[in-house]
């Protein structure tokens, strides 16, 4: 495991020691190399997990998320180059250091064996994200957004610490790999119901479940491009990962405590999808679509069948790549028109035809068109929810329809129509941006050839 963590940490001195014209080249190439090394973790010969040490382990659930984390760092660096070009050198270096620090924490979170260390690292990811949002965001509302982000996440996850200490008293250990052999079910009592709520709340806020999702659109809209990418692609997946890990420990509470949250998520995914139809702000639309996709993941995790677990894992990976790509596209529009409003960026297809092709591909993967892995994830979730209760087919069908509607609405508003006068002289798309989109799109299409590596531990 250290062969990934230590090179990532060493990216920080590399950043500070690089010459002025070599910062971006060095960091991007080395982080790409790290992500290629991490691919070896996807090959899991044993049927349980790879234990590297007492601290770190990797199993078919954490390996894809870890590879996604390492894959996104070079992409974030590529996306950030333009809007940091006017910053002084020291701030560029600080920015890259923050991203690298965040990546280190995330890798360690996804591979931690022990619940308290998982909790500490889970909270540590908050600090670099907060600094990135509040320091490099575009508008002054970024401070407000940072405040929302901090308080929602902290208030949600404080009860988790108390719950973990009580689990420690109950079982004598907080090791993921040992607790799964703990055979005494939790008795039905009020204290255990509160224990379940405390454990779940932290991850529900992080996901976010509908009703606790208000920090997400704010944080997404105000964050700079790398902040949006890492927030949508990985920080939301921390919630799903934690839920997948901890629901199996808390049975039989989960089976009856899950009902209100299942209802809330099924309702919330329709609501947030409908909100998307009326958005004018491009980044806000993508943020709300993230909420509706994550609601599907919550439903899948709480149903607790092997099929739904497979769907949840596949959907998390697919959504990570898709939403990150959409944020990159929104950012390339923003850098040219200096506005996030969709109506002011209309008719770009005539001016940037290649970007229009990427927009089309990204919108189609967002609405889960075959052969993308989004379809695989959504099919598993829809089928498992249908076998859990037949009525959900109405809600699921409505959600899929509305998702298709707002994805196409986003595509048509930004690409078609007569272009406005203030974008007569815009720069053509750079090779950097096209490479960035290709690096997002290729995994989405290639994974559909061999989806078993992202189907999690129940495959």
Swiss-Prot record:
One Pfam family from the record: Proton_antipo_M
Presence of the UniProt keyword Mitochondrion in the record: yes
Protein species of origin: Equus caballus (Horse)
Membrane topology: Multi-pass membrane protein
Compartment list: Mitochondrion inner membrane
GO BP term, example: mitochondrial respiratory chain complex I assembly
Subunit field text: Core subunit of respiratory chain NADH dehydrogenase (Complex I) which is composed of 45 different subunits.
GO molecular function, one term: NADH dehydrogenase (ubiquinone) activity
Role description: Core subunit of the mitochondrial membrane respiratory chain NADH dehydrogenase (Complex I) which catalyzes electron transfer from NADH through the respiratory chain, using ubiquinone as an electron acceptor. Essential for the catalytic activity and assembly of complex I.
Main location: mitochondrion
Catalytic activity: a ubiquinone + NADH + 5 H(+)(in) = a ubiquinol + NAD(+) + 4 H(+)(out)
Keyword Transport set for record: yes
Transmembrane segments: 22-42, 60-80, 95-112, 113-133, 147-167, 193-213, 224-244, 256-276, 284-303, 308-330, 351-371, 391-411
Cellular-component GO terms for this entry: mitochondrial inner membrane; respiratory chain complex I
Enzyme Commission designation: 7.1.1.2
This protein's UniProt keywords: Electron transport, Membrane, Mitochondrion, Mitochondrion inner membrane, NAD, Respiratory chain, Translocase, Transmembrane, Transmembrane helix, Transport, Ubiquinone
Protein name per the record: NADH-ubiquinone oxidoreductase chain 4
Domain of life: Eukaryota
Database matches in InterPro entries: NADH4_N, NADH_Q_OxRdtase_chainM/4, NADH_UbQ_OxRdtase, ND/Mrp_TM
Family: Belongs to the complex I subunit 4 family.
Organism placement in taxonomy: Eukaryota, Metazoa, Chordata, Craniata, Vertebrata
């Amino acid at each position: 495991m250290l062969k990934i963590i230590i090179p990532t940490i060493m990216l920080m001195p590399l950043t500070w020691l690089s010459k002025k014209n070599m910062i971006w080249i060095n960091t991007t190439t080395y982080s790409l190399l790290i992500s290629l090394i991490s691919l070896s973790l996807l090959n899991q010969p044993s049927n349980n997990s790879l234990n590297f040490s007492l601290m770190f382990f990797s199993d078919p659930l954490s390996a894809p998320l870890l590879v996604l984390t390492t894959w996104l760092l070079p992409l974030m660096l590529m996306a950030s180059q333009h809007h940091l070009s006017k910053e002084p050198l020291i701030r560029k270096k600080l920015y890259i250091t923050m991203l690298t620090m965040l990546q280190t924490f995330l890798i360690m979170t996804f591979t931690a064996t022990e619940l308290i260390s998982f909790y500490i690292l889970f909270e540590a990811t908050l600090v670099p994200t907060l600094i990135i949002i509040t320091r490099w965001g575009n508008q002054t509302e970024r401070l407000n957004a940072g405040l929302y982000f901090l308080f929602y996440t902290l208030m949600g996850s404080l009860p988790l610490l108390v719950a973990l200490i009580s689990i420690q008293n109950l079982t004598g250990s907080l090791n993921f790999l040992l607790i799964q052999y703990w055979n005494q079910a939790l008795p039905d009592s009020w204290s255990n119901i509160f224990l379940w709520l405390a454990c779940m709340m932290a991850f529900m806020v992080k996901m976010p479940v509908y009703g606790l999702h208000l920090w997400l659109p704010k944080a997404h809209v105000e964050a700079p491009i790398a902040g949006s990418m890492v927030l949508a692609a990985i920080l939301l997946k921390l919630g799903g990962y934690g839920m997948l890990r901890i629901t199996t420990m808390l049975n039989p509470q989960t089976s009856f405590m899950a009902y209100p949250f299942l209802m809330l998520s099924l309702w919330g995914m329709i609501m947030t999808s409908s909100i998307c139809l009326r958005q004018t702000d491009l980044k806000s639309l993508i943020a709300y679509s993230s909420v509706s996709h994550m609601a599907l993941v919550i439903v899948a995790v709480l149903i607790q069948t092997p099929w739904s677990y497979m769907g949840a894992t596949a959907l998390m990976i697919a959504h990570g790549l898709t939403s990150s790509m959409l944020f990159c596209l929104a950012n390339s529009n923003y850098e040219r028109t200096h506005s996030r409003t969709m109506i002011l960026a209309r008719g770009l297809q005539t001016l940037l035809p290649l970007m229009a092709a990427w927009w089309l591909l990204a919108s189609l993967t967002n609405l889960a068109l075959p052969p993308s892995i989004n379809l695989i994830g959504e099919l598993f979730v829809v089928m498992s929810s249908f076998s859990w209760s037949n009525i959900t087919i109405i809600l699921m069908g409505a959600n899929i329809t509305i998702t298709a509607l707002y994805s196409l609405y986003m595509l048509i508003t930004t690409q078609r129509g007569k272009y406005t006068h203030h974008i007569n002289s815009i720069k053509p798309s750079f090779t950097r941006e096209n490479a960035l989109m290709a690096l997002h799109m290729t995994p989405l299409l290639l994974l559909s050839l061999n989806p078993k590596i992202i189907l999690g531990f129940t495959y």
